[in-house]
């Protein structure tokens, strides 16, 4: 075998083998990809990686990877397809058919035929039919025929016919009018708008939850830091008391009390560490960092040092106005009411009798050749008809459906009023919460400052022997609690603002988030 032939044969065999093993290779590639991802997860677990991250970064991660957002994002696209499906009712339909029919049989008459009657018929028809948004139905047909037989009495043999014809049916009562016939389109469009509001609500919930988890993590970082400082104060005090005990200034009871307090603070620090890790994991879950092979085990370092305090003057009436304008759940409910109005309209229309006016106009062309048939299809040979069709239902089922739709609307209106009451109460509650938390921050700031000043003074008194070990330990606890209360006040104030924005439907606007339509 020559070299070129061997090359061609080898390539052919390789091609066949590749085709047969394609499915197996694809499965193997998927398996390797899973193994690589598993390896990356395990490798990341062995690394001490630090991820510097801010609030804006967390929101960006959430918008990109949060599973609830990814699932809900598909809903408007599904509703867009429903709109196209509804509009398809008004798209024209082309139809065509071809029939060849041959018939040979014994003749029962001598008139025009011999002993055998033979016919051959070819039909070729085409047409366009459809419906306008007014309910008018149209049907435009082009009918052609070629007929040949062995009958001697047939004047044209073969003969061709060409018959253009248009038929129009116009409903007068039932199924008449633009509003009734486009009801499905309008409902589908409203359903899409409702799904967009639902998507907006999902994004708002995810963003608000992300911000809250971020502030919780910030709180537990500060909590861990405060507990660390508190433990250090106890250790420093223990060293001082050991030196004093050696000099006989304090008793063994003072040492025991200091050691007991230090043990309790070590326990509190461990608890703070556990809470910190849990808060870190919660933040990773909402941002979906937990599914990142490289970042799932990274230590999060916040670029924002401490929570901000920006005192805001909140206007209750303006907040309520915003809620009724921007809240997705309220807007979605109003869209649903519009759909119910449309369903009542269509149910009421179904009560009317069917009265359809029909009319058709056609031309008859006949000739020995097809061209002759085309030329003879003139107004001299017309085919027309007019008429009407009447159907009067007993009305039992249609009347029941109409009554049902009215009751559903009344029920929905009551539901809307209840929702409006809940919105008012919720917004008022959130406005109050912001005001209370703002005052809490002011009070806790003063308390922290006073406790810090008091502890500094008590330290001097303790150094002078005027304060007992028990008292100085108590002052340390009070200082740590005051510091923690202030941080908690800041966190709670920021969370109150987050909840207020969400209750007004302003979460996306306040965070400069614009959703794609």
Positions of predicted regions on the chain:
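A glycine-/polar-enriched beta->alpha junction
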Residues: 61-70, 77-92, 125-158, 167-184, ...
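Periplasmic alpha-helical coiled-coil/stalk elements that build and connect Gram-negative outer-membrane
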Residues: 86, 196-319, 433, 478-479, ...
